[in-house]
Amino acid sequence: MHCPYCNASDTKVIDSRLAAEGAQVRRRRSCNSCQERFTTFEVVEVVMPRIIKSSGKIEPYDNDKLRRSILLPLQKRPITIDEQEAMISRIEKRVRQMGEREVSSKVLGEIIMSELKTLDDVAYVRFASVYRDFQDIDAFHQEIANIRPNDK
């Protein structure tokens, strides 16, 4: 691994530990040339299915797009980065376990919603409002009633 500070190839691993529910290995490294320390993350490279959009267009899976769509409703919520990364890993794992070469964006959206629902109700409603295209306040009330069926 080359040092990001001086580009030397003489680096060593100081510490390794699992992250994101075991889906990543976090490594602290030290450069033997400039003595700077840096962190790297190691993940298994897997092939994700392609995404079939509602228009019928087929796109390659985009981890960054998934991440952006999840991080937006989680803004200013008390969710740690580790919890966010773990949720992203669970979503990707569920999609891979389907064993399909192509998955509809609707199925992916429902998986995201189910994960958000278990993580944070506010983030879930934020995501649902965009995903389900809420047109008025009644749609918000209905969705909140669905996640809290015992409240009147």
From Swiss-Prot:
The keyword Zinc applies. GO terms for biological process: negative regulation of DNA-templated transcription. Negatively regulates transcription of bacterial ribonucleotide reductase nrd genes and operons by binding to NrdR-boxes. The lineage of its organism: Bacteria, Pseudomonadati, Pseudomonadota, Gammaproteobacteria, Moraxellales. The keyword DNA-binding applies. Residues 49-139 form the ATP-cone domain. HAMAP family: NrdR (MF_00440). Keywords: ATP-binding, DNA-binding, Metal-binding, Nucleotide-binding, Repressor, Transcription, Transcription regulation, Zinc, Zinc-finger. This is Transcriptional repressor NrdR.
